[in-house]
Amino acid sequence: NVSSEAAIVYNASKKEVVFEKNAHIKKLTASICKVVTALTALENLNKSNYLIISDEMVNVEGSRIYLEVGDIISIETLIYGLLLRSGNDAAKALALAYNNNEADFVYKMNELVKKYNLKNTIFNNPSGLDEDTKNYSTCYDLAILTSVALKNETFSKIFKTKKYSCTLPN
């Protein structure tokens, strides 16, 4: 008996749905969209590169990793902050690290979704914060995207991490 409105159990190795309840109903993604943000960053940015944090990157709502203007931080460390702390500032920084343009990064997120022929998912921003129902997906699409992400060695390593700390070079 599942009390949630929508749910899925997906066997990624067999590419098989074991259980589903309303798995194709569109819902707001909220922070689960950060799985796609992380995968998009890993596919389009060099995780070893460093980024200087700008004012635009720190002015975000919601959960944060508390970046400060002038911080110098690696792409990989930002992905840790994105996935472990659900850092909206990390999401914004990663998006702006791609062509210095959040819209270009979000376009890449949506291209990633299309690559797997998932027609019920669309992103409008990299954080999942959404007041206008523009970031949506389904349990099914998110199960597929998460199984794809877990095949990425760096994503899988970060996703399994229980505790992470870093020292910034500045």
Describe the residue ranges of each PLM region.
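Active-site-adjacent loops and short helices of periplasmic peptidoglycan-processing enzymes
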Residues: N1-E153
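Extracytoplasmic
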Residues: T146-N170
